[in-house]
């Protein structure tokens, strides 16, 4: 009597749509989903009233910087969310991972709502708000960053499944782009401007909301890097010199795109914030992303911004401690934001 062939266990990027959560193949992804639930916050908890007063105190150059920042925020997380649905959820074949991605999509929606609220508060003129939402079309420095994103989306959007090593390599580059370059560099650059204002006692509401967005984005990036680690264990042949060079070139291109944005925001420079210091900061962050991916750093720069060292950690911790017990979701362990800067 013949026996049924033994089922071959699939890899994370194998085509298919696994549904079974028991037994779990990737329990770490499930634990990340559970941890993310503990970090729930809502836009209504961010108080922007004092920001309106602060905005009136800003110099013309600082007001220009804020206008550009909220214009970038208006579209940045929407691009991330679209790639999450159209690419990551489609090709990461793990129900545990898809649980986390579902939660991440919710968090991206909260971020979009937060930035929408920022726009309504910071830009009361309807024409100014409309221009901010059209930033991808009418602001060259933001358009350059968007085109960088779309290039890596277009690389995989027509793939129905990851049948070949070439397909999987293209997917990995998309995943690394959104984790290391977009969430891990573009948004970290934006956070630096926010915390620069915060270090001067300005825009408390923006900084508070950014603390919570930052915590979410750090978890998103960490999840994506764990996916990369898992694929590296399952299919090490994908991680050759070609991929290393492509990722390094990608990070270099992302740094240059973000520097173009910095030139737009900083102009001739503001006290404590200029293009040269942003270049050093971005190079430092890019090196950290490369190191996390197991590749050699290329810049050797150090973080020039003292205000980025654990900025806002105490407030972030206090937020979760002071919530009403009927709504509170516990946060366990320590809050360490320093490493990823």
Each predicted region: which residue ranges?
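Non-heme di-metal
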Residues: 2-341
């Amino acid at each position: 009597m013949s026996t049924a062939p033994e089922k071959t266990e699939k890899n994370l990027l194998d085509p298919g749509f696994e549904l079974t959560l028991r037994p779990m193949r990737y329990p770490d992804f499930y634990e990340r989903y559970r941890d993310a639930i503990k970090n729930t916050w809502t836009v209504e908890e961010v108080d922007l009233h004092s920001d309106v007063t602060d905005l009136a105190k800003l110099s013309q150059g600082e007001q220009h910087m804020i206008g550009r920042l909220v214009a970038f925020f208006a579209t940045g997380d929407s691009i991330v969310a679209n790639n999450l649905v159209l690419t990551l959820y489609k090709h990461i074949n793990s129900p545990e991972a898809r649980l986390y991605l579902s939660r991440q999509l919710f968090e991206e929606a909260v971020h979009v709502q937060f930035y929408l609220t920022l726009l309504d508060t910071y830009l009361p003129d309807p024409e100014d708000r409309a221009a901010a939402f059209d930033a991808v079309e009418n602001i060259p420095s933001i358009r350059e960053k968007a085109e960088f994103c779309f290039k890596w989306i277009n690389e995989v959007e027509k793939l129905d499944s990851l049948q070949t090593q070439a397909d999987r390599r293209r997917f990995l580059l998309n995943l690394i782009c959104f984790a290391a370059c977009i969430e891990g560099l573009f948004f970290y650059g934006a956070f630096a401007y926010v915390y620069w204002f915060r270090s001067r006692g300005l825009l408390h509401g923006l900084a508070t909301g950014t603390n919570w967005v930052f915590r979410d984005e750090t978890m998103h990036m960490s999840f994506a890097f764990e996916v990369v680690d898992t694929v590296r264990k399952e299919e090490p042949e994908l991680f050759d010199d070609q991929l290393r060079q492509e990722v390094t070139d990608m990070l270099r291109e992302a740094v240059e795109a973000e520097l173009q944005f910095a030139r737009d925001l900083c102009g001739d420079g503001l006290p404590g914030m200029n293009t040269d210091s942003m270049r050093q900061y971005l190079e430092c962050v890019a090196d950290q992303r490369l190191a996390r991916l197991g590749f050699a750093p290329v810049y050797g720069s150090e973080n020039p911004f003292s205000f980025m060292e654990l900025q806002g950690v105490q407030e972030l911790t206090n937020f979760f401690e002071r919530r009403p017990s009927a709504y509170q979701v516990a946060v366990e362990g320590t809050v360490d934001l320093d490493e990823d800067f």
